[in-house]
Each structure stands twice: as C-alpha cells, then as structure tokens.
C-alpha cells in the first residue's frame, strides 16, 4: 500500500513536463502569475536578495509534497516526522551557513564592551537557540499538519453521521479544508525560513 510504483513516477514526471516545458500557453501564464504573486507575498530584501527565491522554492516544494502525497496516497508526507525533520534540517542548515558566511556573524558573537562572562553566557544561549530551530520547525509543521488532518476528518465524520452519507459536498468540503491547511502550513514554514535568512 505504501509502495511507489513505476506508473506513479512516470505520471509525476509526465505532469511535471507540462508545468515546466511549455514556453507559451495558458498554463505557463498561470504559473508565472502565481510565482510573481508569491514573490510579492514573501517580499524582497535588499540585504539578502535571494531570500524570497529560497522561500518561494520552499513553499512550492512543500505544496508539491503535500498535494502529491494527499491526492495519490491520502496521506501527506509533511505529517511524517522523518520527512519533516530532514527537510527542516536542510532548510535550517542553509540559513545557518548563510549566517555564518556573513559579516554579521563575527560581530554577533563578540560585541565590543562586553565582559568575557557575558559573552560566554550569551554565546551558549545563542547556540542553544540556533540548534533548537530545526526541532521547532519539525514539531510545528508535523503537528499542525496532523492536527489539521484530524480536525477536518472529525468534522467530516460528524457531519456525515448527522446528515447521512448521501451528501457528496461533505467530502469536497473536507478535502478543501485539508488543502487550506496545506497552504497555511507551507506558508508558515517557508516564512520562518525567510525570517531566519533575514536575521
């Protein structure tokens, strides 16, 4: 049941070619408008020009994972701790390496006029704060996706028990609620990565 078959990969690649290889057409126009609106939503920083691109890329990858897993296997991979932890660790590591390579890192670690004890204690606090971020990102995304899934399924089951199972719109409503949760959680995760990059 949880196996990936050749036809699944073939269909995924087949659909991807329509998204990325069309030079002109309605689908290409819609994708461009969607991407431009995402760059507007994530804003643009003069100090770190690629931060919005990284956030938009993270948002699109998370949405693809959420929708791809949900509509093919009825389970979102972002609800699995393993997938979310690896993705959060990679995203956090990119923000950490960007921060370390900047000039702010040396100024941030030793401020002029501070005593050695204060610098050491602040360094320990900052290290704990920095290394707890991937765990916080993992827990936040996994728990919110799972809670959103459980709430929408409980609402669906409750409405189905009270109204009967002849209403198709109840299942459509539950699917739309799940999709809304996917959008919100992907946005929050990518926005946090954007904020980590702009520190």
UniProtKB/Swiss-Prot annotation:
Impact when changing residue 51 to G: In strain: VT847
Q: What does this protein do?
A: Mitochondrial membrane ATP synthase (F(1)F(0) ATP synthase or Complex V) produces ATP from ADP in the presence of a proton gradient across the membrane which is generated by electron transport complexes of the respiratory chain. F-type ATPases consist of two structural domains, F(1) - containing the extramembraneous catalytic core and F(0) - containing the membrane proton channel, linked together by a central stalk and a peripheral stalk. During catalysis, ATP synthesis in the catalytic domain of F(1) is coupled via a rotary mechanism of the central stalk subunits to proton translocation.
From the Swiss-Prot or TrEMBL record, state where the protein is found. Mitochondrion inner membrane
What mutagenesis or variant effect is reported for residue 53 to L?
A: In strain: VT847
Gene this protein is translated from:
atp6
Query: Per UniProt, what is the membrane topology?
Result: Multi-pass membrane protein
Q: What are its GO cellular component terms?
A: mitochondrial inner membrane; proton-transporting ATP synthase complex
Quaternary form? F-type ATPases have 2 components, CF(1) - the catalytic core - and CF(0) - the membrane proton channel. CF(1) has five subunits: alpha(3), beta(3), gamma(1), delta(1), epsilon(1). CF(0) has three main subunits: a, b and c.
The transmembrane residues are 2-22, 53-73, 80-100, 141-161, 169-189
| Record family assignment | Belongs to the ATPase A chain family.
Please give the Gene Ontology molecular function terms for this protein.
Answer: proton transmembrane transporter activity
Q: Which PROSITE patterns match?
A: ATPASE_A
User: This chain belongs to which protein, by name?
Assistant: ATP synthase subunit a
Origin superkingdom? Eukaryota
Could you tell me which species this protein originates from? Caenorhabditis briggsae
GO biological process terms on file? proton motive force-driven ATP synthesis
Q: Which Pfam families does the record match to this protein?
A: ATP-synt_A
Keyword vocabulary terms for this entry: ATP synthesis, CF(0), Hydrogen ion transport, Ion transport, Membrane, Mitochondrion, Mitochondrion inner membrane, Transmembrane, Transmembrane helix, Transport
């Amino acid at each position: 049941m949880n196996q990936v078959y050749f036809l699944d990969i073939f269909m995924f690649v087949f659909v991807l070619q329509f998204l990325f290889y069309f030079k002109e057409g309605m689908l290409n126009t819609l994708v461009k408008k969607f991407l431009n609106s995402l760059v507007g939503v994530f804003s643009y920083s003069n100090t770190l020009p690629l931060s919005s691109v990284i956030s938009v890329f993270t948002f699109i990858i998370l949405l693809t994972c959420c929708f791809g897993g949900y509509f093919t296997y009825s389970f979102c991979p972002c609800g699995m701790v393993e997938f979310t932890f690896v993705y959060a660790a990679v995203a956090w590591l990119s923000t950490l390496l960007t921060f370390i390579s900047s000039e702010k890192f040396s100024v941030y670690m030793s401020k002029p006029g501070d005593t050695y004890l204060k610098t050491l204690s602040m360094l320990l606090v900052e290290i704990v704060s920095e290394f707890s971020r991937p765990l916080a990102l993992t827990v936040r995304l996994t728990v919110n996706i799972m809670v959103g899934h459980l709430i929408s399924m409980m609402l669906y089951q409750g409405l189905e028990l009270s109204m009967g199972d002849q209403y198709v719109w109840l299942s459509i409503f539950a699917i739309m609620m799940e999709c809304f949760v996917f959008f919100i959680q992907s946005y929050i995760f990518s926005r946090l990565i954007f904020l980590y990059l702009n520190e």
